[in-house]
Design a protein with these regions (language model features):
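An acidic-aromatic
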Residues: 57-58, 126-187, 322
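N-terminal leader/targeting segments and the immediate start of mature chains
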Residues: 55-116, 320, 326-328
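Sec-dependent bacterial lipoprotein signal peptides
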Residues: 2-55
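Amphipathic hydrophobic-ligand
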Residues: 110-117, 141-147, 262-267
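Hydrophobic lipid-interacting interfaces of membrane-associated proteins
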Residues: 100-104, 136-138, 150, 157-159, ...
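Flexible, processing/modification-adjacent segments and terminal tails
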Residues: 74-77, 156-239, 318
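Extended lipid/amphipathic-ligand handling interfaces
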Residues: 82-83, 118-123, 145-147, 268-275
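Gly/Pro-enriched, hydrophobic low-complexity segments
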Residues: 56, 201-321, 325-328
Length: 328
């Protein structure tokens, strides 16, 4: 006995009107419907044909980075000694710079670029600093900042305002540039030594940069020299900073600094090294404060290292009648 299922397959259990399959040509359809079916069929066949023949592909030729011509090697101890030597080699600095500032970023949804200013930087170890910016054309003071490492003064003559206090930021200002402190400048201008008690690690990485001379992409290997601190007597280690060192010349091209919670607070970029008094120093430095929302771009036009600087050159006098804001 045939099963109901086999009868269904043979069409014996299918209703008569359902079992009859009529050709497409016998169906009553409007001319528009028939035209649509013909077009859809042709389009489907065309797509299948093009896809199988490769006509739908498009290959783009990408620039392939070239390997670095020179790759240098160094042990962790040699990297530490190199950073320490560079710090010890600079006792003082007298520089003429072009200063460009910008505030905002992706989190703000916009970036505001300020007019470039000519300025001067004085630095003397261990912590003396003075940064002066001049207004365009008239070249009167736009701002003047001085610090002895413990206290600082920031004078803004166009507004007859001044800020006096320690190096920290207790209450951030709505104006990001008002949160700029001398220690941010100092630690970016001179990469500090690595202490005897610091915990250090070294990793290797690769970055792709465009060569400023050949304009070609170059794949440069680097060393990442990380400095850690231990949280009390615990096993917890927190990052303090990471110095990124190019293996093409063993010079730093970036430093990342972290706060007590492990957040990046300052990223400083170094490029266009030149030799001054037998010391290689970058002539372009970018200080990025992502959380504060500002960047300071410094282009060095003139630099003198290790010449005597007097205490008077770091003394900032606030004119009478200036509105002074004292901060902790």
């Amino acid at each position: 006995m045939q099963s109901i299922f086999s009868k269904w397959l043979l069409g014996r259990e299918i209703p008569r009107r359902m079992a009859q399959v009529r050709p497409l040509s016998e169906l009553r359809m409007s001319s528009g419907c028939k035209k649509w079916l013909r077009t859809a069929g042709i389009s489907l066949l065309t797509a299948v044909a093009l896809g199988t023949s490769g006509c739908l592909k498009h290959t783009r030729i990408l620039e392939r980075p070239q390997p670095a011509a020179v790759v240098m090697s160094a042990s962790p101890q040699q990297l530490i000694q190199s950073v320490d030597r560079r710090y010890d080699a600079i006792h003082s600095m007298n520089a003429t710079v072009q200063i460009r500032a910008s505030v905002g970023g992706a989190s703000k949804g916009k970036v505001t670029d300020y007019t470039s200013l000519r300025g001067y930087i004085l630095l003397r170890q261990p912590a003396m600093l003075r940064v002066l910016g001049l207004l365009p054309v008239v070249e009167t003071r736009a701002f003047d900042m001085a610090s002895d490492g413990k206290n600082f003064k920031l004078l803004i003559p166009p507004k007859s305002e001044a800020v006096v206090g320690s190096g920290g930021v207790s209450t951030p200002s709505p104006n990001p540039l008002m949160n700029l402190r001398p220690n941010i400048f100092f630690d970016s201008l001179v990469i500090r030594k690595i202490g005897q008690q610091d915990l250090v690690y070294v990793t290797m990485n690769t970055r792709v940069e465009r060569d400023p001379h050949t304009k070609k992409m170059v794949q440069e290997p680097d060393y990442d020299l990380g400095i850690l601190r231990r949280e009390g007597n615990s096993q917890e280690l927190m990052p303090v900073r990471v110095v990124h060192i190019s293996r093409t010349d063993l010079l730093p091209y970036q430093q990342d600094e972290y706060d007590a919670h492990g957040n990046v607070v300052t990223k400083t970029f170094y490029s266009l090294y030149q030799t001054f008094d037998q010391i290689a120093y970058p002539t372009h430095i970018v200080i990025d404060r992502p959380a504060d929302g500002y960047k300071i771009d410094l282009t060095f036009q003139k630099l003198t290292l290790n010449r005597p600087l007097s205490n008077d050159q770091f003394e900032l006098k606030i004119p009478a009648g200036t509105k002074i804001k004292h901060i902790p």
